[in-house]
A protein has these predicted regions:
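A short coil-to-beta-strand element that immediately follows conserved catalytic motifs
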Residues: 87-98
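Non-heme Fe(II)/2-oxoglutarate
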Residues: 1-88, 108
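A short, polar/charged loop/turn motif at coil->beta-strand junctions and beta-hairpin connectors
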Residues: 7-10, 92-94, 131
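Catalytic core of non-heme Fe(II) oxygenases with the double-stranded beta-helix
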Residues: 97-142
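Generic structural signal for short, solvent-exposed loop/turn connectors between secondary structure elements
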Residues: 1, 18-24, 94, 113-119, ...
Length: 142
């Protein structure tokens, strides 16, 4: 008997470095946002010791002085999403929401999932050179 292999449940992870994003602006925006908005209580579900912004579904809800930079960032994300979408053959996708996390020394993210998401992503603005851990992915096939 000859066996044929097929891939049924792959886990594909895309990674890249986007040099078009103004990280300095995003870092300043994140720190400003943290200073004016306390972390919502639901953020304790996934963040341990850090700050987690509210979820941003509507760019127009962002303060005017931050909007241009956030829109430019979102446009870069949209370009990446479109590239992945075409490669894997998904129908047109719509960017749903994002949030900002700030984790200082000793803070971390708990394992969590993003239900009902076709794609999820992480964009690192600033990472110290030491005392940081790697991102981890788990797959629950139960």
């Amino acid at each position: 008997m000859t066996l044929k292999s097929t891939t049924w449940f792959p886990t594909v992870i895309y990674a890249g470095l986007n040099e078009n994003v103004d990280r300095k602006f995003l870092k300043e925006t994140a720190l400003y946002w943290q200073s004016v908005e306390p972390a919502p209580t639901y953020s304790m579900n996934s963040n341990d010791g850090g700050w987690h912004s509210r979820s941003i579904e509507i760019i127009d809800a962002v303060e005017d002085k931050l909007k241009d930079g956030i829109v430019a960032f979102k446009n870069e994300l949209d370009n990446s999403i479109e590239e992945v979408r075409k490669e894997i053959g998904f129908p047109e996708l719509k960017f749903q929401n994002f949030w900002i996390n700030i984790n200082g020394y000793g803070a971390s993210h708990k394992f969590h999932n993003h239900p009902d998401s076709l794609l999820s992503g992480v964009f690192y603005i600033d990472i110290p050179n030491d005392n940081t851990s790697n991102i981890e992915f788990q797959r629950n096939d139960d």
